[in-house]
A protein has these predicted regions:
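Short linear interaction motifs
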Residues: 40-42, 257-265
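Bulky hydrophobic/aromatic "packing anchor" residues in well-ordered structure
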Residues: 44, 144, 282-283, 308
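A short catalytic or substrate-binding loop motif that flags glycine-/basic-rich loops and adjacent residues
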Residues: 51-54, 261-263, 273-276
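C-terminal substrate/ligand-recognition segments
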Residues: 271-276, 280-289, 335-355
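S-adenosyl-L-methionine
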Residues: 319-333, 346, 350-359
Length: 359
């Protein structure tokens, strides 16, 4: 069996004031009498198998006891794999005998911490970038730059070509009826929203955290968080979108404050994507992020979010694009479908690993 969950499952919760760990409790449940699975627990990331998104995930593999012992006895596992399998077998046997093990944080193996098990068969499939040639971490730009304009597709990146080869029965690089892939309806926004998105783009480029924090604080509470001279100096060379649709710069505190006043918001979760980095994890709501391109002051389409996760373009999402209120009890909109999905490249890597175990 395989269980997939978000990284949050690794964090503790309190029961009667004492820390408990959901992932460890689930592993114990699978190892208990009547269930009889030997667990191997992993913490992996979709970007390590080629997806253009930083998407860490907890994976638990549950092996039927006979299969587990057969794999352990065959001699194919490396030193770290043998160590992990022996540790899991002892964990399983203790639970079967009624000896409940104490919490052990080392019972899951973390790719983010470069655990050496991911250099060995078959776990190395979860740390194998599919790009040919030099190792390459896929970026936001790799994933969506060719479909940024409503006028049609430009030259796709190697990343896009790769994900469109994932399922030959679904995908070709032939032109679509509209010139653009499905689920790629660009959203329209008013002047103030566009101006705010341009502000987020500027903020995303600033490496100086105190400057960014000053700007965020001012937008949230201008009375108690005035603009500093350093902020004005830092932003003076940047171009902002004014309410009349033109781009302009601000060299004085007074003009910058006047421009920022309509931008004030208590919503602090929105941000602009960074073109040369993988997309962030939290992308499941249409308003989570805006485009990185100065000419594309808008939120992301369903297709763009799907591209980050490595979904081929011919994989079409159905249902409503968005929904809300009571209807969320009955409907799963397209943005939620993408946000809750397992990236195909990660699914493929996990499947390959399981196939190797079974063979």
């Amino acid at each position: 069996v395989m269980l997939e969950n978000v990284t949050g499952i690794l964090r503790a919760f309190k029961v009667d004031g004492k820390p408990r760990y959901a992932w460890f409790e689930v592993a114990k449940a699978f190892a208990s009498i009547g269930c009889d699975y030997v667990p191997i627990c992993l913490h992996v990331n979709a970007r390590n198998v080629g997806a253009a998104q930083n998407r860490p995930r907890y994976i638990m593999l549950g092996f039927e006891k006979k299969l587990f012992k057969r794999i352990l006895s065959k001699g194919s596992l490396g030193a770290e794999g043998k160590k992990a399998f022996n540790k899991s077998l002892k964990f399983f046997e203790n639970i079967q005998q009624g000896n409940v093990p104490s919490y052990d944080a080392s019972f899951y193996y973390d790719l983010a911490k470069s655990h050496p098990i991911f250099n060995e068969w078959p776990f190395k499939d979860l740390n194998k970038n599919p790009f040919e040639g030099e190792p390459h971490i896929a970026t936001v730009s790799d994933a969506i730059h060719d479909i940024r304009s409503p006028e049609g597709i430009s030259q796709p990146s190697d990343y896009v070509k790769m994900i469109n080869r994932l399922s030959p029965s679904l995908n070709t690089l032939s032109k679509y009826e509209s010139g653009l892939p499905p689920n790629h309806k660009l959203r329209a926004h008013g002047a103030r929203v566009k101006a705010r998105f341009r502000l987020y783009q500027v903020m995303a480029k600033i490496a100086n955290k105190p400057i960014v924090n000053n700007l965020k604080s001012y937008l949230k509470d201008p009375v108690n968080n005035p603009i500093t001279d350093d902020l004005v100096s830092h932003l003076s060379s940047e171009q902002f979108l004014s309410m009349d649709g033109g781009f302009r710069s601000f060299s004085s505190k007074e003009t910058l404050e006047k421009f920022l006043t309509p931008m004030q918001t208590k919503k602090q979760t929105q941000r602009a994507l960074v073109a040369d980095s993988p997309a962030p994890t939290a992308l499941s709501i249409a308003d989570d992020a805006c485009h990185y391109d100065k000419e594309q002051l808008r939120t992301l389409t369903v297709r763009e979010m799907a591209r980050f996760q490595s979904f081929p373009d011919k994989f079409e999402f159905r249902s409503k694009v968005t929904t809300g209120g009571r209807m969320r009890q009955f409907e799963v909109p397209q943005y939620t479908q993408v946000g809750n999905a397992v990236p195909p490249l990660l699914g493929k890597a996990l499947g390959k690993m399981c196939k190797e175990f079974l063979s």
